[in-house]
Amino acid sequence: LKAKAQYNLNDWDSFVMIQTLVNTIYAKEAKLTKTLHAIDLLRGMGYKARFAEGEDKTPYLLISIKQQIYSKSFYDKDVSRFYIFAVDAHPRANYTQPIYFFNSPDDGMGRQLDMVMHKNPNIGKNDSPIKLSWDFDGKQYQMIVKANGELAALMDMYPQADYGIYMQSRSGMPLISEISSSLMVEIKKNNFSKEKAVAFVLRFSQKAFTYNTDFDAYGFEMPFFAEQTILLPYSDCEARTTPSLHLYIEIFGYDSVELHYPGHMPLAVA
């Protein structure tokens, strides 16, 4: 709990921290030992975690999660949905074999893990320079911002979840604020009207990042957080929607909503 407060960790960050911790401290121990220690630590932090075994006696860590996540097997048990994780594997790894629960007196205790990133974790530094270039109204623009590679690496461990979670999340906000400040400087320098300023930010969102579909670029469909969109070489319409939404809020204070059509996701601004 002290580390969670010190590093300003969200629930998911805390889960990854526990996974990393047990694999480091108990590196030479059996998978069963690591799994039991991870469950004990997660329960100590107030989360609803349980132990289970596969048919082949492989130990699994089960954690109850508040929101739905995808491409991940789960079991509904005692009015809670538990997603299956292996303590020594990437969090996105999926498991399909039948599992068997082991009951203990405190199985019903604890709270569900919240996947929304309500705050920006205090890890790493914004030290990866990224050049962003775009055109607007016949003129070329560019800015150099510094992204947090460690934060992006943490986000890369995030399982596929509903798009709304990415829209609600506040991770990566220092980078968004830096971009917002640079855009506002140009808006004031060019004395753009309100309508032209909105179009200017829209043009930035469309042209500052190289377009490609997730399937072509990465082999699977995956929403991204703002930091990932800016750091990764390619992004699609869904990935661009996340930083765009936060930019409109930061710069203009406008309400925004994503519109999810089959194969496309635009952003509506009020």
Predicted regions and their residues:
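Intrinsically disordered, low-complexity N-terminal segments that are enriched in acidic
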Residues: 1-135
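Active-site neighborhood of thiol-dependent amide/isopeptide-bond enzymes
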Residues: 27-35, 213-268
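Sec-exported extracytoplasmic/periplasmic mature domains
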Residues: 42, 46, 206-210, 246-253
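Hydrophobic transmembrane alpha-helix bundles
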Residues: 87-98, 161-164, 248-260
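The feature marks a conserved, polyanion-engaging helical scaffold used by nucleic-acid processing enzymes
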Residues: 98-208
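Extracytoplasmic/secreted proteins, especially bacterial periplasmic and envelope-associated proteins
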Residues: 36, 40, 196-200, 204, ...
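Secondary-structure boundary elements
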Residues: 1-19, 167-232
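Hydrophobic/aromatic-rich core segments of domains that either
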Residues: 49-77, 84, 186-192, 239-270
